[in-house]
Amino acid sequence: MSFDLRTRLDARRAAHLYRQRPLLQSPQGPQVIVDGQPLLAFCNNDYMGLANHPEVIAAWQAGAERWGVGGGASHLVIGHSAPHHELEEALAELTGRPRALLFSNGYMANLGAVTALVGQGDTVLEDRLNHASLLDAGLLSGARFSRYLHNDVSSLEARLEKSVGDTLVVTDGVFSMDGDIADLPALARSAKAKGAWLMVDDAHGFGPLGANGAGIVEHFGLSMDDVPVLVGTLGKSFGTSGAFVAGSEELIETLIQFARPYIYTTSQPPALACATLKSLQLLRTEHWRREHLTRLIQQFRRGAEQIGLQLMDSFTPIQPIMIGDAGRALHLSQLLRERGLLVTAIRPPTVPAGSARLRVTLSAAHSEADVQLLLNTLEQCYPLLDASHSSEPVHA
């Protein structure tokens, strides 16, 4: 019996859910070349505008000269280089925690943390809109797995009453497709009241949130006692690649011993850690980046309201324009692209059925003129949305 892959692919295409990879032919930034076309992009996660920063590039080059271009082995063999260790110490300082542990990417950090902490006989409770990596981690952990209603503390508490064994409450800090933030103070209170631990994946909060860019935990003034497990990624606001988990001495040592995605993989290039150390320095010292980004977010929301666009309740750089139908979302994305703007249409299964959207993301590298151009073009294109649309998707 053969695998009928063609039928699956045809069904996805017919539902306007077929995904294709745009080919980036320039460095990351607001001005890009995609599939040969110059475009103004509003769809990357380089929130602080550091992915193509000359000082970060120079740090990578110097790191490669000093340390070479490969990690060479896993961290537990001979792949844990001095730059890796220095970056872990810097990330621990940023988060105000005793230790931090580097992972190769955010998916591996989430999978490693959850599966190392809970298993059969334990409980994982997750927000239903968590990132796919967190949901996969919960399912793969072998623990009793349940999802509570989005940002709904009462729904969480009802599930906490039925939890068994060690219980891990897991949430995004900033929800990647909606842009809203978790009610961490309430989640922390509920978890602590039942003796559960709270784990936060703050992939999209580091950089934009907090007085020093230390994310949602800093934003709310919470402690390690409130949020014992804190995850961050380095491929967004830090402008490089990788991820980390920050927490207590015991937590990090537990992950080193039991987190299989950490143990059984080659370390990242040491030069990458050198680059990230530089971007971390810029993130902590160049506060104008957060201030400028905040102004751009406010500008976009004011303008979108005047146009009559339906936005989500978000004060973060993630500003989704709700469309509903996947075909209509693709059509609006195509209309913008024809006018030189790149904004990705997000469709199921990434978001729930009937909630397709254009996911606008803003960066400190954008200018006020860039945002105004986006608003002007949206005002032109939105009335055209109900015209016949192409069945060929152009983005994810």
UniProtKB/Swiss-Prot annotation:
Its cofactor is pyridoxal 5'-phosphate. The gene is bioF. GO terms for molecular function: 8-amino-7-oxononanoate synthase activity; pyridoxal phosphate binding. It catalyses: 6-carboxyhexanoyl-[ACP] + L-alanine + H(+) = (8S)-8-amino-7-oxononanoate + holo-[ACP] + CO2. Keywords: Biotin biosynthesis, Pyridoxal phosphate, Transferase. This is 8-amino-7-oxononanoate synthase. Catalyzes the decarboxylative condensation of pimeloyl-[acyl-carrier protein] and L-alanine to produce 8-amino-7-oxononanoate (AON), [acyl-carrier protein], and carbon dioxide. PANTHER family: 8-AMINO-7-OXONONANOATE SYNTHASE (PTHR13693:SF100), CLASS II AMINOTRANSFERASE/8-AMINO-7-OXONONANOATE SYNTHASE (PTHR13693).
